[in-house]
């Protein structure tokens, strides 16, 4: 079992629903530790930079507009197989297709307002974590 880190974002829709604590409980209940966290209002430039990989996709503008529509909570999760564990907790991108009991099935409204973001691979996680958290702001526990 590998100890990994992954980036997690609680998106504006879930922050507005006041389910941050419930989502954090799921992370911790699955054995994931929160080793860095902050609440922020993303600027357009931050959101465009973070999602630059999708810049040519038709949904890019709507995604950026959504991500800057309200505050988000950005955290780094650490634990055994953290990336896949976090993705399992999140559920499918489309909440209608997400398994019952996943974060998206329970808290998301649509494929766009889908409550959470999570890194999809180890290399992606490293890049995403570095984007929001300089190394000196992440603390192993």
UniProtKB/Swiss-Prot annotation:
GO cellular component labels: cytoplasm
Residues that bind ATP: 11, 59, 87, 93, 104, 114
Any Pfam family the entry gives: NDK
Active site: 117
SUPFAM superfamilies: Nucleoside diphosphate kinase, NDK
Gene3D superfamilies reported for this sequence: Nucleoside diphosphate kinase-like domain
EC category: transferase
Localization terms from the record: Cytoplasm
Keywords: ATP-binding, Cytoplasm, Kinase, Magnesium, Metal-binding, Nucleotide metabolism, Nucleotide-binding, Phosphoprotein, Transferase
Keyword ATP-binding: yes
GO BP term (any one): GTP biosynthetic process
Principal location listed in the UniProt entry: cytoplasm
Cofactor: Mg(2+)
SMART domains: NDK
Catalytic activity, EC: 2.7.4.6
Keyword DNA-binding: no
Chemical reaction(s) catalysed: a 2'-deoxyribonucleoside 5'-diphosphate + ATP = a 2'-deoxyribonucleoside 5'-triphosphate + ADP; a ribonucleoside 5'-diphosphate + ATP = a ribonucleoside 5'-triphosphate + ADP
Matching InterPro entries: NDK-like_dom (IPR034907), NDK-like_dom_sf (IPR036850), Nucleoside_diP_kinase (IPR001564), Nucleoside_diP_kinase_AS (IPR023005)
GO molecular function: ATP binding; metal ion binding; nucleoside diphosphate kinase activity
Function: Major role in the synthesis of nucleoside triphosphates other than ATP. The ATP gamma phosphate is transferred to the NDP beta phosphate via a ping-pong mechanism, using a phosphorylated active-site intermediate.
Quaternary state and interactors: Homotetramer.
NCBIfam families the UniProt entry points to: PRK00668.1
Family: Belongs to the NDK family.
Annotated protein name in UniProt: Nucleoside diphosphate kinase
Gene name per UniProt: ndk
């Amino acid at each position: 079992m590998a100890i990994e880190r992954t980036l997690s974002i609680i998106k504006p829709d879930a922050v507005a629903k006041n389910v941050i604590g419930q989502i954090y409980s799921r992370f911790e209940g699955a054995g994931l530790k929160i080793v860095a966290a902050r609440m922020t209002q993303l600027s357009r430039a931050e959101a465009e930079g973070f999602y630059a990989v999708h810049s040519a996709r038709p949904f890019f503008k709507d995604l950026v507009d959504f991500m800057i529509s309200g505050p988000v909570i950005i955290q780094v999760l650490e634990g055994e197989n953290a990336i896949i564990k976090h993705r399992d907790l999140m559920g499918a991108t489309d909440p209608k297709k997400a398994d019952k009991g996943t974060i998206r099935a329970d808290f998301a409204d649509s494929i766009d307002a889908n409550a959470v973001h999570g890194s999809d691979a180890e290399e992606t996680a490293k890049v995403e974590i570095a984007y929001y958290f300089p190394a000196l702001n992440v603390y192993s526990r």
